[in-house]
């Protein structure tokens, strides 16, 4: 996104860590962000602390900038607190690749907060290393940019309520209703 105007800025949100807000009015269909992942792991590696101990320092630095809740959201112990925190950050901020057991994290896209009523949607590009974020409905300047953490593939049926609740368990969210534009 180097050659594009940034239409968002990152801010501290009072109740949910950091997030993105629009720097100007954004209209439906408009591109917000196109970004390459910086780390991809399969589901078994995403649970292996030794993988996080061996990460390249540049990747560790990028991962360390993502959200890390104080409560423990990882269901196993480790004696290495730094790697444990990186593991928690990966697990909290990862996005699944469609139809695969691989998950990835991004420097900026991973900062977009969840909403049961999203105003942007995300999709993987064909190369499966790049994701785009586009506007679902008009977003006013200063309004938070939010997405649903449930992948809504245009070819798939909308998940049933109990499926949506299970999908959101890792983040401890409960959506009582969903609105998709």
Mark where each language-model region is:
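Catalytic cores of histone-lysine modification enzymes
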Residues: 30-122, 170-176
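Conserved SET/PR-domain catalytic core that frames the SAM/AdoMet-binding pocket
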Residues: 12-45, 132-156
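Residues embedded in well-ordered secondary-structure elements
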Residues: 15, 101, 164-166
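Generic detector of ordered secondary-structure context
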Residues: 18, 24, 82, 104, ...
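C-terminal SET catalytic tail plus cysteine-rich post-SET Zn-binding segment of SAM-dependent SET-domain
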Residues: 114-181
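Short, structured beta-strand/loop micro-motifs enriched in basic residues and often containing a Trp
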Residues: 7-17, 122-131
